[in-house]
From Swiss-Prot:
Residues 159-339 are annotated as: NBD1. This is Chaperone protein ClpB. ATP 1 binds at residues 206-213. Disulfide bonds: none annotated. Residues 558-765 are annotated as: NBD2. GO terms for biological process: cellular response to heat. Residues 390-525 form a coiled coil. It comes from Wolinella succinogenes (strain ATCC 29543 / DSM 1740 / CCUG 13145 / JCM 31913 / LMG 7466 / NCTC 11488 / FDC 602W). The lineage of its organism: Bacteria, Pseudomonadati, Campylobacterota, Epsilonproteobacteria, Campylobacterales. Residues 766-857 are annotated as: C-terminal. The Clp repeat (R) domain probably functions as a substrate-discriminating domain, recruiting aggregated proteins to the ClpB hexamer and/or stabilizing bound proteins. The NBD2 domain is responsible for oligomerization, whereas the NBD1 domain stabilizes the hexamer probably in an ATP-dependent manner. The movement of the coiled-coil domain is essential for ClpB ability to rescue proteins from an aggregated state, probably by pulling apart large aggregated proteins, which are bound between the coiled-coils motifs of adjacent ClpB subunits in the functional hexamer. Residues 85-146 are annotated as: Repeat 2. The gene is clpB. Belongs to the ClpA/ClpB family. Transmembrane segments: none annotated. Pfam families: AAA, AAA_2, AAA_lid_9, Clp_N, ClpB_D2-small.
């Protein structure tokens, strides 16, 4: 067996990488510089692990290795097949084989090859230029740790913990973790479990985003700050990366081998607490036919207390994976993490504010933090605090940073204006000389001069603002770095340095920042192109974008619009002032922030005969609130007359057809949480439908077939019914009519349903005077259709009255009116258009004559 056959997989992969580098550099032979370069660009190689331990910057070494490759002979016509291995490289492999045999290895590993050739040229000159070669040797030997290479994969498991884990205590030492605010009780309970003799493995259970990982980071920070019991001091918290463990495990048993090596390394170290995030992934991880999964490999060590492990997963995954495996479940002690309150979330946001400001180079107002906590809790109901509030702040800051780093809108507009004028000027210069062209060129020249002057002014203002802004950002970054240095100095006992930073350098920077902020405020008074702070409005804008709920503070124009809601609704709905007044009151309460937090904006039952405007009122309301009726969720209750149909609102139960599709009501509101929901002809629905509606009307929430809660607090619920329409028609006296209607309602609906409604509104029967008004509204719709063709229409008063008489029926309300307009107006218009009697620019007048409607052009 020659040296090439005795190489480990890692050394063979390095040689293949070196071959590719030689081909790319057009070198006919693979040589030592190619091997060195291949090892340096492989971030997981043993060489890079050693360099990281030494704190050496490998970028300079990479450049040096590349320059060595560039000096090698080149050939123009090369393929992978005709590249050879140089004699120097072949000899180096032979030397490595001899060194390996001497050390008891059966295969040549990467570190053996390095150790055998570090004192040979060109590797000696390459490494000695930037580091101590003897120290590199010591680090390579310490990574090996005396292990023997007995198989081709053995060198993959050297320093397994460093390769497959992230040292959180090291990150805490370097101040790279965000501060952990609160959660003292949970951290204390976790430490208590870790100190136990056996089964000392806590598992953090909580919904996604409540801060399970942050609690472990908090423990790492306390270990560094020595704020833990004596038995936990000097411990290391290492987060295990399960995906890295599984990735690249090509051969059977390779994953188990890697995990066993990690477990052995943890046992050997004695001071490592292993953290496995999403710990449910260990169940079944790496298992294939005839092999064990990660959970079964870890169980014995967990039970004996040899392995300190902290797990983190959601309650749902814990039930699914752990509760089914009692042997695994009993090895972990659960710690439940509840979602923090708004005030607790606010404290967390204040704690990480400085880090976010330093990252994005912006200022975050405290009002923005308060808005993020409150608005996320109120409107983003499918996620959990503090994660959703942090996301809001982060996205708002990122949006602001993007605006700062881009060209201001005013400058972009002027630039485009200058380009347009330049193009127009060139086009005119190419034309033959004419008086008109010359005059226009002079105009363009004047406009260009003005635009360029304006551009220069704005550019100077922009540069000035950016200079102030960049200096503020630089000061924030420096202050953040100094705080980190101060913390490290305190930990190492260098209190003189810490005092110098805390009482000298940082206050100096803070004073300069105050001066710059004062300067910035003065600039803002005269109007700035840049905005440097995340405000309450920024957060509201992000919430609106995520949820389609208009959360932004009302501008004056919108306030006027809301105050005029009743008049706006009356434009489309005639003769129902009482109904429109009740709807308007509910909208005003909501817009003023006075509506109840745990109920829909409003819930109404519209009663009245057919054709009086019940459904039209709902459509008009949706159009008013959203400028279109697309946010009207209309559910025809005649489709829900059978018992089995009621489940379609929330979705079919598991095992039934349509389970995956979800509910027709719940899915519609999940997509558009700010909607008008119309339950048309509610009296036709099966009684089970009312049981579903009770929860919506009372709590503003509904749970669908998958157990997901859907929020109805931003909806307006409207139910329409023809119940007691005969009583409404018979009684002209308001009090008698209302008592008759209430008596009729009690026969159809349960008291608990009626009591949950905000208002029961009776729509009045329409009279001839109201029908005439409706004729004008409907005729306006016909006008709109012909506006594009520039055909104008006019309807005389006598024609309106004639159509109203033809289309009026007290029993059917305004519905026959549409048919009357079709027959008397639209049919005539269609004939005139098809006969080419009217065309663009025509004016058509409809009038009544001799009891008939005539058209005059």
């Amino acid at each position: 067996m020659n040296a090439f056959e005795k190489m480990t997989h890692q050394l063979r992969e390095t040689l293949e990488q070196a071959l590719s580098l030689a081909l790319h550099a057009k070198n006919p032979e693979v040589d030592l510089p190619h091997m060195a370069w291949a090892l340096l660009i492989n971030s997981t190689s043993i060489l890079n692990q050693a360099l990281n331990k030494m704190g050496v910057d490998k970028s300079a070494l990479e450049l040096e290795a590349k320059s060595l490759v560039d000096r090698l002979p080149q050939s123009s016509s090369l393929t992978k097949e005709n590249i050879k291995i140089s004699k120097r490289l072949a000899d180096s492999l032979t030397q490595a084989e001899a060194l390996g045999v001497k050390g008891g290895d059966k295969f040549i590993a990467v570190d053996t090859w390095l150790l055998a050739n570090l004192k040979e040229e060109p590797l000696k000159s390459l490494f000695s230029k930037y580091l101590d070669v003897n120290e590199l040797k010591k680090n390579l030997e310490s990574i090996r740790g005396g292990a023997k290479i007995e198989s081709a994969t053995d060198d993959e498991n050297l320093e397994s913990l460093a390769k497959y884990g992230i040292d959180l205590t090291q990150k805490a030492l370097e101040n790279k973790l965000d501060p952990v605010i609160g959660r003292d009780e949970e951290i204390s309970r976790m430490m208590q479990i870790l100190i136990r003799k056996t089964k000392n493995n806590p598992i953090l259970l909580g919904e996604p985003g409540v801060g399970k990982t942050a609690v472990v980071e908090g423990l790492a920070q306390r270990i560094i700050a020595k704020e833990v019991p004596l038995s936990l001091q000097n411990k290391r918290v290492v987060a295990l990366d399960m995906s890295a463990l599984i990735a690249g495990a090509k051969y059977r048993g390779e994953f188990e081998d890697r995990l066993k090596k990690v477990v052995e390394e943890v046992k050997k170290a004695g001071n490592v607490i292993l953290f496995i995030d999403e710990i449910h992934t260990i169940v079944g991880a790496g298992a294939s036919e005839g092999s064990m999964d990660a959970a079964n490999i870890l169980k014995p060590a967990l039970a004996r207390g040899e392995l300190h492990t902290i797990g983190a997963t959601t309650l749902k995954e814990y039930r699914k994976y752990f509760e089914k495996d009692a042997a695994l479940q009993r090895r972990f002690q659960p710690i439940f993490l509840n979602e923090p309150t708004i005030n607790e979330a606010l404290q967390i946001l204040r704690g990480i504010k400085e880090r976010l400001e330093a990252h994005h180079n912006v200022t975050i107002y405290d009002s923005a933090l308060v808005a993020a906590a409150k608005l996320s809790s109120r409107y983003i109901t499918d996620r959990y605090l503090p994660d959703k509030a942090i996301d809001l702040i982060d996205e708002a800051a990122a949006e602001l940073k993007m605006q700062i780093e881009s060209e201001p809108t005013e400058l972009s507009l002027i630039k485009r204006q200058i380009q347009r004028l330049e193009v127009e000027k060139e086009a005119l210069l190419m034309e033959k000389e004419s008086t008109h062209s010359e005059a226009r060129i002079k105009e363009i020249q004047a406009e260009l001069e003005n635009a360029k002057e304006r551009q220069r002014t704005l550019l100077a203002q922009f540069e000035n603002e950016k200079a102030v802004f960049n200096e503020i950002a630089s000061i924030k970054a420096k202050a953040d770095e100094l705080r980190r240095e101060s913390e490290l100095a305190k930990r190492s006992g260098d209190y003189n340095k810490a005092a110098e930073i805390d009482y000298g350098k940082i206050p100096e920077l803070e004073n300069r920042e105050k001066e710059l902020n004062t300067q910035w405020n003065r600039m803002q008074e005269s109007g700035t192109l840049l905005k440097n702070a995340v405000s309450e409005e920024s957060i509201a804008g992000i919430v609106s974008r995520w949820t389609q709920i208009p959360v932004k503070k009302m501008l004056q124009g919108e306030k006027e619009k809301v105050l005029g809601v009743e008049e706006e609704l009356r434009k489309d709905v005639v003769g129902q002032d009482e109904a429109l007044h009740a709807i308007a009151r509910a909208i005003k309460r909501n817009k003023a922030g006075l509506s109840e937090n745990n109920r829909p904006i409003g819930s109404f039952l519209f009663l009245g005969p057919t054709g009086v405007g019940k459904t039209q009122s709902a459509k008009t309301l949706a159009k008013f609130l959203f400028d279109s009726d697309k946010n009207l969720v209309r559910i025809d209750m005649s489709e829900y007359m059978e018992k089995h149909a009621a489940s379609r609102l929330v979705g079919a139960p598991p095992g039934y057809v349509g389970y995956e599709e979800g509910g027709q009501l719940t899915e519609a509101i999940r997509r558009k949480p700010y909607s008008v929901v119309l339950f048309d002809e509610i009296e036709k629905a099966h009684p089970d439908v009312f049981n579903i509606l009770l929860q919506v009307l009372d709590d503003g929430r509904l749970t669908d077939n998958k157990g997901v809660t859907v929020d109805f607090r931003n909806t307006i619920i409207i139910l329409t019914s023809n119940i007691a329409s005969d009583k409404i028609m018979e009684n002209s006296d308001k009090e008698r009519r209302e008592s008759a209607v209430k008596a009729e309602l009690k026969r159809y609906f349960k008291p608990e349903f009626l009591n949950r409604l905000d208002d029961i509104i009776i729509f009045n029967p329409l009279g001839l005077a109201q029908i005439v008004e409706i004729v004008e509204i409907m005729f306006e719709g016909i006008r709109e259709k012909l506006k594009e063709r520039q055909i104008t229409l006019e309807l005389t008063q006598s024609a309106k009255e004639q159509i109203a008489e033809v289309g009026f029926d007290p029993v059917y309300g305004a519905r026959p009116l549409k048919r009357a307009l079709y027959e008397e107006v639209e049919d005539r218009l269609a004939e005139l258009i098809l006969e080419d009697k009217i065309s663009e620019g025509s004016h058509v007048v409809f009038d009544a004559q001799g009891g008939k409607i005539i058209a005059r052009i």
